[in-house]
Amino acid sequence: MAAIHQKFGRSIPLSAMFEYGSIRRLADLLRADADAPAATPLVSIQPKGKKPPCFFVHPAGGNVLCYYDLARCLGTEIPFWGLQAALGEGGVAPGSIAKMAEIYLEAMLDIVHDGVPILGGWSMGALAAFEMARLFHQRTGVAPIVAVLDQIAPDLTSDSTSGSEDLTAKLFAFANKVSELVGHDIGLSKELLAASSMEETNSLFLDKFKAFELAPEATRVEEFQGFLKLMLDHNRITGEYEGGLYPGRVLVFRAEGKMSGSTSGPG
């Protein structure tokens, strides 16, 4: 998408990458006079099938590409949708998990008019999916199954950051998470981050993301700074979420391996 914007000056939503799933079809879209499909939280990753659809909420950072392989493994009998955060101009993160869940539930109900969906998510997305299920139950009296991928109970989560922590501490915590993800120290020390302006910090992180192939080479600093702000906002609301009672089934899926520093298990 960054390369398309750089080359053609056109911004298209992630949903178009799945809907127009070939170079030829994307070219037709770019040639058309009509604008690209309107931005929406809903991303149709695998639209086929007549079984109850799955709706998986993005983790912190807002992207649902992490669910592509999962949707593929589930086959073509189960429609699979992602709920992706808005990352464009004016795309501000909701102020709480509860508000996020409300927005995403409304988007889901635009296309789900009967039946009971399956809700799920990875990391922060699991909390938003759980809250969506609570709201769905409050409205309909029906409790959907919730699939929780590698996310523990809110009061035990290692992702939380207190309001008293300064920006440097939050950025350093994020740098440590990236180091765990790639299996190497990415070299962003607390001292370096403290001495850097926010503009410099965006460039530092983007350079590391490109070096470890976490971001395309064509990604611009302007695009990345929106992602970094969204990541910090998501980490904040994750730490503030307290959850609540839910009468439905919650299925917890955990990876066999564990990153260093992660909490031992779900609460």
Where would I find each of the regions flagged by the language model?
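A hydrolase-biased, glycine/serine/histidine/acidic-enriched motif that marks catalytic-domain neighborhoods
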Residues: 24-267
